[in-house]
Amino acid sequence: MKVIPLGERLLIKPIKEEKRTEGGIVLPDTAKEKPMKAEVIEIGKDVEDIDIKVGDKVIFSKYAGTEIKIDDEDYILIDQDDILAKVEE
């Protein structure tokens, strides 16, 4: 299924990083904070004034957007104003 964001929205896929304690114990998802880093999957046609393209990594507001599930994968539909930064690695 393909989802195309409307207006000034983007479809992003959160990047989940495995968290371990100093002792090497892997923390379950319920003990971790929400991810704030994501990959841009689709961009709405009205998104302007930001230098972001599909495939870029971004930092977004912690509780922004609407979480959706597509083909058993987690995504977020988010307003362009909730994108805080572009990550360059």
Swiss-Prot record:
PROSITE patterns: CHAPERONINS_CPN10 (PS00681). Transmembrane segments: none annotated. It holds the Pfam family Cpn10. GO terms for cellular component: cytoplasm. Keywords: Chaperone, Cytoplasm. One of its GO terms (biological process) is chaperone cofactor-dependent protein refolding. Its main location: cytoplasm. It is found in: Cytoplasm. Together with the chaperonin GroEL, plays an essential role in assisting protein folding. The GroEL-GroES system forms a nano-cage that allows encapsulation of the non-native substrate proteins and provides a physical environment optimized to promote and accelerate protein folding. GroES binds to the apical surface of the GroEL ring, thereby capping the opening of the GroEL channel. Heptamer of 7 subunits arranged in a ring. Interacts with the chaperonin GroEL. This is Co-chaperonin GroES. It comes from Kosmotoga olearia (strain ATCC BAA-1733 / DSM 21960 / TBF 19.5.1).
